[in-house]
């Protein structure tokens, strides 16, 4: 529960939920701003109660989260702002287009997958994410609009590109010398074990000696 909160330029990667909003902001006429954040490879990018309102999202990147946005139970997140001053967010599963090349999609981004709506009500169903059953349900909702659930999120100005936060982009990815030394040692041990298995050393091995008896010629 917070007020006067601004969450900017964070990288949230590989968590159960990138951000969870319960009752923020608390006071009326207060807006919480999420700007320039990087939510990637989480189970859920942003999760909130359906009653949550007045949260503004601008310039965030939602990258390959199993579920980009989720409500806890029935409802939606439409009482929040998913674009500010004509600038929305980047969504990795957005399939729209940018006809005028301004970097903003001409088609709104919507979170309205049938299987995701079911998992919001029945979380245990997430075990079947990416299963043939979940894909079939989503395909059926696309083919038959009457099955399509109400959207939970509508971003009217989705971004076509995203920017990696500076503190991630500048991370030195060059392997250290100690890492290389340990790797070479492990490779050497692995090679020695392989050769020993392929050509085992036989100890105390003696070749059999064959003896031949000779009989003298009888006179």
Predicted regions and their residues:
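Alpha-helical transmembrane segments
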Residues: 189-202
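Cytoplasmic C-terminal tails of single-pass
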Residues: 201-219
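Surface-exposed loop/turn motifs in large extracellular/passenger domains
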Residues: 1-8, 23-35, 51-58, 75-88
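Short glycine/acidic-rich loop motifs that flank beta-strands on beta-rich extracellular proteins
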Residues: 1, 16-22, 43-49, 66-72, ...
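Acidic, glycine-anchored loop motifs typical of Ca2+
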Residues: 98-116
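Juxtamembrane/start-of-transmembrane alpha-helix segments at the extracytoplasmic/lumenal side
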Residues: 165-189
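Juxtamembrane amphipathic/hinge helix adjacent to a transmembrane helix
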Residues: 104-110, 135-171
């Amino acid at each position: 529960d917070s007020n006067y909160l601004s969450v900017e330029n964070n990288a949230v990667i590989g968590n159960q939920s990138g951000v969870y909003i319960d009752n923020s902001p608390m006071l009326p006429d207060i807006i919480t701003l999420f700007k320039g954040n990087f939510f990637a490879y989480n189970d859920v990018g942003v999760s909130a109660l359906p009653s949550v309102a007045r949260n503004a999202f601008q310039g965030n990147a939602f990258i390959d989260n199993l579920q980009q946005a989720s409500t806890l139970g029935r409802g939606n997140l439409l009482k929040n702002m998913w674009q500010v001053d004509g600038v929305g967010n980047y969504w990795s599963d957005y399939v729209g287009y940018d006809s005028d090349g301004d970097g903003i999609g001409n088609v709104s981004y919507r979170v309205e997958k049938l299987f995701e709506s079911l998992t919001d009500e029945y979380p245990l169903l997430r075990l079947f994410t990416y299963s043939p059953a979940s894909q079939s349900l989503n395909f059926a909702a696309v083919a038959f609009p009457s099955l399509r659930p109400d959207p939970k999120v509508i971003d009217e100005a989705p971004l076509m590109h995203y920017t990696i936060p500076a503190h991630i982009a500048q991370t030195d990815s060059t392997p250290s010398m100690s890492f290389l030394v340990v790797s070479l040692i492990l490779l050497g041990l692995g090679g020695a074990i392989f050769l020993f298995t392929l050509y085992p050393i036989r100890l105390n091995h003696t070749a059999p000696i064959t003896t031949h008896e000779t009989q003298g010629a009888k006179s």
